[in-house]
């Protein structure tokens, strides 16, 4: 069974490789997963993965950034599940590339932190975070597990730099901790996980995550209201889910900002409060309070607009 994290990585590996940003993404791969060898006074750099899409991504990044085609070696593991293993081997200009990416310093020493040119550029930071997640990141399925996204680092200073990228540029409220022989940065807030997926370019995965999160949170809210009438709860949840679906369609096809102001306010409030009943929405909507029938009338208008957009498409 393909995991949710695998789906996210599949989407990321399908993104176009931008020449200006390839080096930042490649730097994350090589710094986090590269294995350097020296034979006959020649450097060789290997990156191994069981994911063929990631292997192709690394190949494309190297070719785009430096015009070099590395070797791509496929082998079959003989232990456990006997999966295929993909090795990307760079044998040309290894020293020059590692120096250019600031993985080596001028004295051929290893730099384990993230270079300043990435730490000071939001666009490069986005590309580096994408590479870091592909190299050693994971995210739980929002439908079945607790909300959790993490990236593993071998070195503490690299982990702290990842934390700074995530928090200083993108305000993700990331945390850090020690993990066995290394370190991790992690996110626990569902909203921040969705933001991270969007930042690194996994837009479809982010939309799927948000849909699952909304439905999961709605189910949890329903379960907490144990003293309420079950039939009424189901009716409220179903109505809210349909309203959210209509609003999301309008947002995608038309833009909420193009609605009349009263409908825009209500639509955005409903997206952030899918668990509220019609009565609660009427009492708490920002331009309210208004009557329950007034709220219902606005939702009917939203429903009509969504229906029209469906028919047009």
UniProtKB/Swiss-Prot annotation:
Record keywords, A-Z: Cell cycle, Cell division, DNA-binding
DNA-binding region: 277-311
Official protein name in the record: Probable cell division protein WhiA
Family per record: Belongs to the WhiA family.
UniProt entry tagged with the keyword DNA-binding: yes
InterPro entries, per the entry: Homing_endonucl, Sporu_reg_WhiA_N_dom, Sporulation_regulator_WhiA, Sporulation_regulator_WhiA_C, WhiA_LAGLIDADG_dom
Gene Ontology MF term list: DNA binding
Summary of the function given for this chain in its UniProt record: Involved in cell division and chromosome segregation.
Pfam families referenced in this protein's UniProt entry, alphabetically: HTH_WhiA, LAGLIDADG_WhiA, WhiA_N
UniProt keyword Cell cycle, yes or no: yes
Biological process per Gene Ontology, one example term: regulation of sporulation
Species for this entry: Lactobacillus johnsonii (strain CNCM I-12250 / La1 / NCC 533)
Species lineage: Bacteria, Bacillati, Bacillota, Bacilli, Lactobacillales
